[in-house]
Amino acid sequence: MGDLITIERHVLESQKDHPGATGEFTKLLYDVAFAAKLVYRHVVRAGLVDILGSAGSTNVQGEEVKKLDLFANEQFTKAIGHHGRFAVMASEENEDIILPPLDKYGKYVLLFDPLDGSSNIDANVSVGTIFSIFKRKSDAGGPGTLEDCLQKGAEQVASGYVIYGSSVMLVYTTGQGVHGFTLDPSIGEFLLSHENIKTPKRGKIYSMNEGYYRYFDDGIKKYIKYLQQEDKASKRPYSARYIGSCVADFHRNLLYGGIFIYPRTAKSPKGKLRLMYEANPLAFICEQAGGRASNGRERILDIKPTELHQRTPLFIGSEEDVKIAEEFEQGLRDIEHDEALCPKSLTSE
């Protein structure tokens, strides 16, 4: 058996490249991993302990809250908020920012989606937790502020996700590559299983909810037709794979290559996914793995948020696939002759 590397050891060893490190960041990530174990313990027992189904309420997004959503949100808030490592937190499930219960405020900011894909819980489909970590901008010593949370994704110091499937895997980046850890339930530790993950430059999978086809812009409709055309040179047609759990679809495409798209629609002109809780953390991971992420026109990590629960379209995955999708979205490409068109501003008069 090879050397067993826990997530705590992995982060500690990476601290050698940062002489000013105090160890707080390592403990912080370990807190996240611990909270994920608590959630997993209940995810696998959900049908036995009466936490499946609806809680009879809606969250700030206007979505029906599942019982396990509430449990996961509570576990992350409690497990992480009581150690004084954070100045402020924000959850997809809470309307306002969350301040630590103690008078000790740390230097980090945590934003998280406690249970992504929760609409699939009752069907026993993979769900996950997504998190994003920033350094506070406000003065140290006091509570964090809303402005601490409204930072560009490019300012993240770490992001990651945990996927609860046939096995439990935690994937994270601190801007020095992407690493995956699989939970060994016999010892209760996340062990390094996927070191320095790199996503293929181009894949053969596209993931999107084509049930909304009638609401898509013409550029996206053309892109779908492009993916379905047969062309051996570009390895088309692509295979459609859509789970309906963003983190699960992203995880598969990260490993095998491909693109996940949740575009703007006539029903959701600003997009559907949350910039702070889903798009930013996944975009950071994707870029660190060699991929690309945008809203179809602008790099996700360059978007300056103006509100806590801001939504955005999302094009994320293999670099070449995302670039082609962006060209269709921007009207720079057409399936009629399958080639990039000159921008309208450059067209000869």
From Swiss-Prot:
Binding positions (Mg(2+) 1): 92, 113, 115
A molecular function (GO) term: fructose 1,6-bisphosphate 1-phosphatase activity
GO BP annotation list: fructose 1,6-bisphosphate metabolic process; fructose 6-phosphate metabolic process; fructose metabolic process; gluconeogenesis; reductive pentose-phosphate cycle; sucrose biosynthetic process
Binding site for substrate: 116-119, 209, 242, 272
Catalytic activity: beta-D-fructose 1,6-bisphosphate + H2O = beta-D-fructose 6-phosphate + phosphate
EC number(s) from the headed UniProt entry: 3.1.3.11
Annotated GO CC locations: cytosol
Keywords: Calvin cycle, Carbohydrate metabolism, Cytoplasm, Hydrolase, Magnesium, Metal-binding
Signal peptide from the UniProt entry: none
Essential cofactor(s): Mg(2+)
Pathway membership: Carbohydrate biosynthesis; Calvin cycle
Cofactor note: Binds 2 magnesium ions per subunit.
Family, as annotated: Belongs to the FBPase class 1 family.
PANTHER family in alphabetical order: FRUCTOSE-1,6-BISPHOSPHATASE-RELATED, SEDOHEPTULOSE-1,7-BISPHOSPHATASE, CHLOROPLASTIC
Stated name of the protein: Fructose-1,6-bisphosphatase class 1
Organism: Chloroherpeton thalassium (strain ATCC 35110 / GB-78)
